[in-house]
C-alpha cells in the first residue's frame, strides 16, 4: 500500500502525470541525512513535551538510525508513493518499527520540516565550498610565493599598461576568493535560525518547547521569531546562490586570464596536460578546456540565482509549492562549484609559468607613467608632466623608436631641464620596486602579503 502524508479528503487518486510533476524524491533524496537529523531532534522534543513515551522515543530513534544507515550504504529502496524525502523516511520507518512511526510527525508540518532540512543542508554546503575556496587560495599563494619578483605586463582595457609582478596577479585572485569566503560565512550566520516548531504556518499548540530543539540541533543558535516568516523564508538559499554566482564570476575572470596567458599570442603560462584536452581533427592542439568550462559554467550559476529569485518574487505568505523549486538550483550550483573549484585549484597548482615570455612582452611604453612620475619628482606638476610625456610618446611613434631609444635632444625639446639620467627610468625591476605603497606590486610588498596570507590560511583549517 502506498504511504502518503495526506489524502483523507480526496475522492480520487492523483493523476499519473500530476504525480510525476509533483513528486520530488528523485532530487530531494540528497536531504536524507539532514531530514533524519531533524526528525531525531523532533522526537526528543516530543518526548520532553510528553507526547510520546520513553519506549516510543527509543523506537523512533533506533528506526531513524536504521533508515540513516540504509541511505548511507546505498541499500535504501524507494517505493511507490514516496512523494518526497519526508514521505520516504516515514514510510520506511513505519516498516521498521511499526505504528510508533505514526507519532513522529505530531505537531510538525512538512513546511517547517523542509525549511529546517534546507537550512541544515545549506550550512553544510556553504562550509564545503569555503574549504574548496581555501584550497584554491593556497594554490594561487604557492604560485605567488615563487614569483614575487617575476615581472610581467599589467593590463587595462586588455592593453599593456604598467609592469607588475606575477605574484601580485596571483594575490589579486586570493583577495577575490577571500571575499567569497567571507560572504559564505556571513550567510551561514543567518542560516542558523531554527524554523522547526513553526508548524504549517501558525505555530505549535501541543506544548513542544522549541528552545529544546536548538539544544538537540546544535547547528542552530536562535529560533525563528515569526512562524509565518519561518516557513516561507528562502532568503538563505538566495544568499548562497548569490555567493555561488559571484564565485562563478571570479572563476570566470581567472579562467579568462589563464586562457589568454596560455595562448601562443601571450605564452605566459602553460596548463598541465592533465587539465587540457586535444582536438579530434587537429593533432597539434592543446586546448585549455578546464578553464573554458569554468568560464562557461559560470553562466548556469548566474541562471540558478535568477531562477530562484523569479520563483520567490510573486509568492504570498506563507508556504507555496513553488518553493519546491528552491532545491534543484541549489543542488546544481553546489555540484558545479564543488567540482569546479577542485579543478581550478589543481590546474593552478600544476601550471607552468614562463617568466621569459613575460619579460619579452614588456616594452618601454609601459614605463610612460614612471617617466611622468620622474618629472613630478623634478618639480613638474603632474598634469603638465602627463602632457609632456604624451608629446614624447608621439615623437617616439613618429621616429619609429621606443622611448628608451628616443634621443636626448627630443627629451630636452619637450622639457629643457632633462639630462641623460632620465634614461634610468627605463628599468622594469626599478619600476615595480618603486610601487611600494601598501597593496602595491613591489616585490617586497608582495612577499609581505604572501607571508600574511600564508599565516592566515594555515591558521584557518
UniProtKB/Swiss-Prot annotation:
Any one GO MF annotation of this record: argininosuccinate lyase activity
Biological or metabolic pathway of the protein: Amino-acid biosynthesis; L-arginine biosynthesis; L-arginine from L-ornithine and carbamoyl phosphate: step 3/3
CC terms in the record's Gene Ontology section: cytosol
Any one of the GO BP annotations: L-arginine biosynthetic process
UniProt keywords, alphabetically: Amino-acid biosynthesis, Arginine biosynthesis, Cytoplasm, Lyase
Source superkingdom: Bacteria
Annotated EC: 4.3.2.1
Family membership: Belongs to the lyase 1 family. Argininosuccinate lyase subfamily.
UniProt-recorded name of the protein: Argininosuccinate lyase
Originating species: Chloroflexus aurantiacus (strain ATCC 29366 / DSM 635 / J-10-fl)
Record gene name: argH
Amino acid at each position: 500500500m502506498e504511504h502518503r502524508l495526506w489524502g483523507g479528503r480526496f475522492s480520487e487518486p492523483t493523476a499519473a502525470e500530476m504525480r510525476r510533476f509533483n513528486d520530488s524524491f528523485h532530487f530531494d533524496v540528497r536531504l536524507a541525512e539532514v531530514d533524519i537529523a531533524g526528525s531525531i531532534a523532533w522526537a526528543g522534543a516530543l518526548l520532553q513535551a510528553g507526547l510520546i513515551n520513553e519506549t516510543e522515543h527509543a523506537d523512533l530513534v533506533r528506526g531513524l538510525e536504521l533508515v540513516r544507515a540504509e541511505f548511507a550504504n546505498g541499500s535504501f529502496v524507494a517505493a511507490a508513493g514516496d512523494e518526497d524525502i519526508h514521505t520516504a523516511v516515514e514510510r520506511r520507518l513505519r516498516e521498521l518499527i511499526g505504528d510508533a512511526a505514526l507519532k513522529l510527525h505530531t505537531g510538525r508540518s512538512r513546511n517547517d520540516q523542509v525549511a529546517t532540512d534546507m537550512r541544515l543542508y545549506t550550512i553544510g554546503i556553504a562550509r564545503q565550498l569555503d574549504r574548496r575556496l581555501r584550497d584554491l587560495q593556497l594554490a594561487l599563494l604557492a604560485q605567488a610565493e615563487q614569483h614575487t619578483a617575476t615581472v610581467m605586463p599589467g593590463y587595462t582595457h586588455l592593453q599593456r599598461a604598467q609592469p607588475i609582478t606575477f605574484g601580485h596577479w596571483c594575490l589579486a585572485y586570493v583577495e577575490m576568493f577571500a571575499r567569497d569566503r567571507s560572504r559564505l560565512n556571513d550567510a551561514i550566520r543567518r542560516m542558523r535560525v531554527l524554523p522547526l516548531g513553526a508548524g504549517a504556518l501558525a505555530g505549535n499548540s501541543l506544548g513542544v518547547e522549541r528552545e529544546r530543539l536548538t539544544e538537540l540541533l546544535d547547528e542552530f543558535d536562535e529560533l525563528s521569531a515569526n512562524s509565518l516568516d519561518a516557513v516561507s523564508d528562502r532568503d538563505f538559499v538566495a544568499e548562497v546562490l548569490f555567493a555561488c554566482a559571484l564565485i562563478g564570476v571570479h572563476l570566470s575572470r581567472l579562467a579568462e586570464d589563464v586562457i589568454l596567458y596560455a595562448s601562443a599570442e601571450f605564452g605566459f603560462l602553460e596548463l598541465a596536460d592533465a587539465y587540457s584536452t586535444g582536438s579530434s581533427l587537429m593533432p597539434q592542439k592543446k586546448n585549455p578546456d578546464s578553464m573554458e568550462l569554468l568560464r562557461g559554467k559560470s553562466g548556469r550559476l548566474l541562471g540558478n540565482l535568477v531562477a530562484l529569485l523569479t520563483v520567490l518574487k510573486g509568492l504570498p505568505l506563507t508556504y507555496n509549492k513553488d518553493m519546491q523549486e528552491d532545491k534543484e538550483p541549489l543542488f546544481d550550483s553546489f555540484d558545479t562549484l564543488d567540482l569546479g573549484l577542485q579543478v581550478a585549484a589543481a590546474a593552478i597548482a600544476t601550471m607552468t609559468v614562463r617568466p621569459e615570455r613575460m619579460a619579452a612582452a614588456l616594452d618601454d611604453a609601459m614605463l610612460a607613467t614612471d617617466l611622468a612620475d620622474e618629472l613630478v619628482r623634478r618639480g613638474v606638476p603632474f598634469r603638465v608632466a602627463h602632457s609632456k610625456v604624451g608629446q614624447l610618446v608621439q615623437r617616439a611613434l613618429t621616429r619609429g623608436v621606443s622611448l628608451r631609444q628616443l634621443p636626448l635632444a627630443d627629451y630636452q625639446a619637450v622639457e629643457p631641464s632633462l639630462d641623460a639620467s632620465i634614461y634610468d627610468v627605463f628599468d622594469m625591476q626599478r619600476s615595480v620596486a618603486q610601487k611600494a605603497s601598501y597593496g602595491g606590486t613591489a616585490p617586497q610588498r608582495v612577499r609581505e602579503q604572501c607571508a600574511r596570507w600564508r599565516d592566515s590560511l594555515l591558521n584557518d583549517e
